Amino acid sequence: MSGASEVPSFRWTQSLRRGLSHFTTSAKGDVLRDAKSLVDGLDFNQVSQVQRVMRKDKRSDDDLSKLRDLNRSVDSLMVMKNKQNNVSLKIGSLSKDELMDLATDLEKLKRKINLGDRQGPGVYQGNLTSAQLEKRSEILKSLGFQPRANQNGVVKVWDIKNPKLLINQFGSIPALTIACMSVQGAEQMNDVVQGLTSLGLLYTVKYPNLDDLDKLSKDHPCLEFITKEESANNISGYNLSLSAAVKAGACLVDGGNMLETILVKPDNFQDIVKSLLVVKRQEKMFVNEKPGLRNPYENILYKLCLSGEGWPYIGSRSQIVGRAWENTTVDLSKEVVYGPSAPVKNGGNMRLSPLSDTQEAVIKEAIGKLDMDETIWIDIEGPPNDPVELAIYQPSTGNYIHCFRVPHDEKGFKNGSKYSHGILLRDIENARSGLLSRILMRLPQKVVFTCQGSDDIQKLLQMNGRPDIATIDMSFSSEQARFFEGVVWEKFGHLCTRHNGVVLSRKKKGGNSGEPHCALLDCIIFQAAFEGQVTGQIPKPLLPNSLIFKDEPRVAM
């Protein structure tokens, strides 16, 4: 990370934790499972050999082969790994300005890293430029000192034919750190976990330093195995450095919204990038093109964009090919894409949508059955930045589009379930990823939605790249809006099968407020309030359950 004189490093880290808290997970169980797998399956004689290699003043192609072979073994034993899922981002959920901002930062990051990697034959310069290395050498000579290798984080050792083979072979992995401390330190894994957890708890309020490590080591002797040498760029994952230990500790802390526990999936990648850019603007974060360690924003930007799927901070990434700016690209050539994407050629970037061409065609056909000249209601459940249900309903025909989405913020979801929609997570855990956003992206530009309360709907449309869609807010009072609620539930309640939780009243402690809020039935209820009567038109779904939910069981009649 950059020095405190350049950026308010820890403040940035805290801001990123808050801004990306919806995407953090409880990773402790997964980390310990992989650590046990490594303890049982890894050849620690090979680990010792690689550790010796990393202490050598000059390393050869044979040494690199040992490192890469061991990295492959580690990767094969782990569940927490990053997958090669190259992404091409287009205007949609991310606006043109956001994409340009992202592209600019990736280009700056590329220049920063390439400048730091610039080297003569067989020399890796680490954190210093050639001019800085020469100046340092002159100063040392003038003071009567002989320059020593491995000082100030500089590694000038890789005398190899193909430097590209070094890419993604470094970086610590918490499961590996725990396994090495347990086996090579002859410590009980539980003791190692306790020691690292203390380090992780300290990390929630400050960056732990060597003084902190010394003090914690008195209560946790296992921490004495952590090296006191300053961490450098491209340090091996087998080095028991302070930064590696802190990262491992962060994964073991329950809560704290630690960035290390972020899990990237194809359906939340754009959401994470969007949230990252929001925090960046709020804190005025930037990419510093000067060679050196990455600041918190540079660090998370690189890690997120490297693979597009997996655990960017703590998963194995040694099998990922390419750099962040190669694996995540920005395409500003088109506005909103309504039709199915073109097939991907071999070696090309994958499209971001998790849906197949056939599924995209079903969505397109369903939307085509809505009459854009007639009233169309829209309603959601959950906040606009994390919706769990979407309904689009046309009263004149009874046609409707209805889908669900697994939330990122489970705590907020449970609160919404308790006091509003009554959806249970188990009832929507197999909801199709990416469906809700693709429906919104495929809507034609001329559509005008009718709704009860437009603020959340407009935010939803804005966040999904559809600020062009207009809304009409009926602005009923609460009593007016829900006048026909009981009748509609009696007549059409069979359509609502995913709202099975008990809903409590916020006004009356312990009281039940009656029926949960279902986005589809709410559309019908609001239309009844507008017409003064409940419709006789039978609602007809436009999307099959097999698309709305993955592995939806088929019942033979």
Curated annotation (Swiss-Prot):
GO cellular component: helical viral capsid; host cell cytoplasm; ribonucleoprotein complex; viral nucleocapsid
Keyword RNA-binding belongs to the record: yes
EC main group: hydrolase
UniProt key word Methyltransferase: no
Positions contributing to Mn(2+) binding: 379, 381, 522
EC number: 3.1.13.-
Subcellular location: Virion; Host cytoplasm
Pfam entry (one): Arena_ncap_C
Site positions per UniProt: Important for exonuclease activity: 456
Listed GO MF terms: hydrolase activity; metal ion binding; RNA binding
Sorted UniProt keywords: Capsid protein, Helical capsid protein, Host cytoplasm, Host-virus interaction, Hydrolase, Inhibition of host IKBKE by virus, Inhibition of host innate immune response by virus, Inhibition of host RLR pathway by virus, Interferon antiviral system evasion, Manganese, Metal-binding, Ribonucleoprotein, RNA-binding, Viral immunoevasion, Viral nucleoprotein, Virion, Zinc
Residues binding Zn(2+): 389, 496, 499, 518
Domain of life: Viruses
Region (Binding site for the cap structure m7GTP): 54-235
Gene Ontology biological-process annotations: negative stranded viral RNA replication; RNA-templated viral transcription; symbiont-mediated suppression of host cytoplasmic pattern recognition receptor signaling pathway via inhibition of IKBKE activity
Subunit structure: Homomultimerizes to form the nucleocapsid. Binds to viral genomic RNA. Interacts with glycoprotein G2. Interacts with protein Z; this interaction probably directs the encapsidated genome to budding sites. Interacts with protein L; this interaction does not interfere with Z-L interaction. Interacts with host IKBKE (via Protein kinase domain); the interaction inhibits IKBKE kinase activity.
UniProt free text on domains: The N-terminal region is important for the cap-binding activity while the C-terminal region contains the 3'-5' exoribonuclease activity. A CCHE zinc binding site is present in the C-terminal region and may thus contribute to the substrate binding and/or the specificity of the exonuclease activity.
UniProt similarity note: Belongs to the arenaviridae nucleocapsid protein family.
Function: Encapsidates the genome, protecting it from nucleases. The encapsidated genomic RNA is termed the nucleocapsid (NC). Serves as template for viral transcription and replication. The increased presence of protein N in host cell does not seem to trigger the switch from transcription to replication as observed in other negative strain RNA viruses.
Protein name: Nucleoprotein
Organism, scientific name: Latino mammarenavirus (isolate Rat/Bolivia/MARU 1924/1965) (LATV)
Gene assigned in the entry: N
